[in-house]
Amino acid sequence: MMINTAVLLIFDFNTNVCIVSQKDLDFSSDVVYEYVSKRLNRIIGDAAQKTGVFYATSAFQMKLQALVDGTLTFDDLASQIARELYQLVSHCDEPESTDLLVIDFQDDDDVRNLGILMLDNKTAYTHQILDDEGTVYNKLIKHYAILPGTAQKAEAYALIRLNDFSIHFVDKKRKMDGEDVYLLPDKLLQCTSVISSKEAVKVVSKIAEKVAEEHGASTVEALSKAKTYLVENAETADSFSPQDLGSDVFGDSPVLQREFEEQVKEAKLPEAVAIEKEYAQKAGRSHKIKTDTGIEITFPSEYIENTDFIQFINNPDGTLSIELKNIGKIVNK
């Protein structure tokens, strides 16, 4: 990744003013480079990203085309984005002071991207050192415009590849005239919204658990099989099919499989969901359960079908026993 340029713009709703910077950020400063690069690295490849396609009538896409063609400068585009977003945020029921970071950068494929990051200001306490006629003293003050730390992900952002105008974004729900809105896709970008891989995995997992529970099947087995499917599928594909996942989890029961497929359709999940291999492996690597007796167990998801290591036994009295096998060593943590 290489950052070409970036600019910071301010939405201050304490004084109701949009401050448009007339200079880009100075990347000769290590502090500036560290903050901007870490912010980008936190969101690139984020599994929570939704994807979108510009509507044919999107005015924003035309501005991007002008940027690519060289008829609109980066600074002019950033200023236009800031003024439009400021107006949108100001019309929200509870406008929050925000710093807007607009970045022009090359990704790891050397494709030019535009990044739009909305950084909500935080209130924090800090110290102030004062000098009163030679007497030095410390004072506690409240700061109303603290930027989120580099370890935090931006709650609202958009990344747009300028070679094909593909969009990846995360946004938070806001209230405008009492109605729920997502400012970035609905108002600024004017684009479609496709479920993120993180959300899709969460939805199919809930459906698998619900179907298993309603039909008296093992929810632990269903969820573990779903996770194993994600890991194995990610080895050869960059997307997964919710329907295929259901076939793999409930392959032994046509009734449960049909029920799963019907609920997937009701949830309006796409036929294929893009998913990063790294996220699939992270999400499917292990499964954690907690018993009503307070015992917690975490085990590799693929072990659910291997009784050499763990076995779930249904007792005659309706209780459940869990047997752990072939343990050579126990480590306290």
Describe the function of each predicted region:
Residues M2-A283:
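Long, hydrophobic alpha/beta structural blocks
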Residues S247-K333:
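C-terminal structured domains
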